[in-house]
Amino acid sequence: MIPVERRQIILEMVAEKGIVSIAELTDRMNVSHMTIRRDLQKLEQQGAVVLVSGGVQSPGRVAHEPSHQVKTALAMTQKAAIGKLAASLVQPGSCIYLDAGTTTLAIAQHLIHMESLTVVTNDFVIADYLLDNSNCTIIHTGGAVCRENRSCVGEAAATMLRSLMIDQAFISASSWSVRGISTPAEDKVTVKRAIASASRQRVLVCDATKYGQVATWLALPLSEFDQIITDDGLPESASRALVKQDLSLLVAKNE
């Protein structure tokens, strides 16, 4: 049986069962564990499946972005750990970008005492928090307002970002996989691509609960990022897949 035939069978089994173990696949196709792993890694790179401990499953699909209020109650411990680790990478006197989101808000909460810092953001909550609690210089992108996420999106925000020179961009996402970060909102894509182009260093900050999720629009491939910061809930198989792509992975320990 040639690889393309095996991979088609894998996709059919995953579609039927949702989650399939590696043992089931080796028995079904009478091939080695290593052969199946190579097939699964290829399918995961294509975004067709997600590797989990001992098996494989279909990628979850994000149909819409949760509101800011909903996101504040999700993965709070993980976001706090990621925020603390990410903030430790910021140097005094630098110009950084904090993407819209509650994970990046957690970064802001660890930066309030840093001297001579410039923070660019498209997030009203982050800007408001830093305005009340820090002495840093704040630059808001402006643009079309997304009420649900209390942030600015679209071409006007992207155009503003293209006029800046950013040292570090901390970029968030509602879904990510080995293919990259994706979003159900097309007007967020142009903003993420603009900040990626405007920044000297690009850091993805995303908790492990969002790994293996996909949405309609691929915003950025993982190859665009210099570092990825996530939490220790990321499956070992996912860590291996990311490291295999020569991606720099930092894992924040949940406290």
From Swiss-Prot:
GO biological process per UniProt: regulation of DNA-templated transcription
PANTHER family (alphabetical): HTH-TYPE TRANSCRIPTIONAL REGULATOR SRLR-RELATED, REGULATORY PROTEIN, DEOR FAMILY
Stored Gene3D superfamilies: 3.40.50.1360, Winged helix-like DNA-binding domain superfamily/Winged helix DNA-binding domain
Signal peptide: none
Record carries keyword DNA-binding: yes
Domain HTH deoR-type positions: 3-58
Single GO MF descriptor: cis-regulatory region sequence-specific DNA binding
Upper taxonomic lineage: Bacteria, Pseudomonadati, Pseudomonadota, Gammaproteobacteria, Enterobacterales
Top-level taxon of the source organism: Bacteria
Alphabetic keyword roster: DNA-binding, Transcription, Transcription regulation
Record keyword Transcription regulation present: yes
Residue pairs linked by disulfide bridges in the UniProt entry: none
Gene that encodes the chain: ygbI
Stored InterPro entries: Carb_Metab_HTH_regulators (IPR050313), DeoR-like_C (IPR014036), DeoR_HTH (IPR001034), HTH-type_regulator_YgbI-like (IPR053533), NagB/RpiA_transferase-like (IPR037171), Tscrpt_reg_HTH_DeoR_CS (IPR018356), WH-like_DNA-bd_sf (IPR036388), WH_DNA-bd_sf (IPR036390)
Native source species: Escherichia coli (strain K12)
DNA-binding residues (ranges): 20-39
Protein name: Uncharacterized HTH-type transcriptional regulator YgbI
